[in-house]
Design a protein with these regions (language model features):
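Alpha-helical adaptor scaffolds
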Residues: 2-44, 48-56
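Boundary/linker segments of alpha-helical solenoid repeat arrays
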Residues: 8-9, 42-44, 71-85
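Alpha-helical linker/edge segments of TPR/alpha-solenoid repeat scaffolds
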Residues: 21-24, 59, 87-93
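Short cationic/low-complexity microdomains
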Residues: 57-63
Length: 93
C-alpha cells in the first residue's frame, strides 16, 4: 500500500489478512470499507467486509454484506462465500 495506496486488491488482501489473524479489526474494516465503496458489486470485497463485520460482532451488517456478495456472484458463488454466509447465519440467530 505504501507504493500504491489506491490499490484496492492489496487493500482487500491486507484487510483479509488482518481479519484472519484477529489483529486490528478496526483497520481491517476501514480498508475493506474503501474497497466496497470503490467496487460495490465485487463479491470478493463484499465477502471480506461481511466477514470482518461478523468478527466485530455486527451480525446484521455481516448478513447484509454476505447476502450482497452472494447476489453479486451470479450463478458461480464461491464456496468460501457460501461458507461464510452459512456460518454467520448459524451463529447470529
Amino acid at each position: 500500500l505504501r507504493m500504491d495506496p489506491r490499490n484496492i486488491l492489496v487493500m482487500n488482501n491486507l484487510a483479509w489478512s488482518l481479519c484472519l489473524i484477529g489483529k486490528d479489526l478496526m483497520r481491517a474494516e476501514e480498508l475493506s470499507r474503501i474497497t466496497i465503496m470503490r467496487e460495490p458489486s465485487n463479491p470478493i470485497y463484499l465477502d471480506t467486509y461481511g466477514w470482518i463485520m461478523y468478527k466485530l460482532g455486527d451480525c446484521q451488517s455481516a448478513l447484509f454484506y454476505l447476502e450482497r456478495a452472494i447476489e453479486n456472484s451470479g450463478e458461480n458463488v464461491e464456496k468460501e462465500i457460501e461458507s461464510h454466509y452459512k456460518e454467520v447465519k448459524k451463529q447470529c440467530k
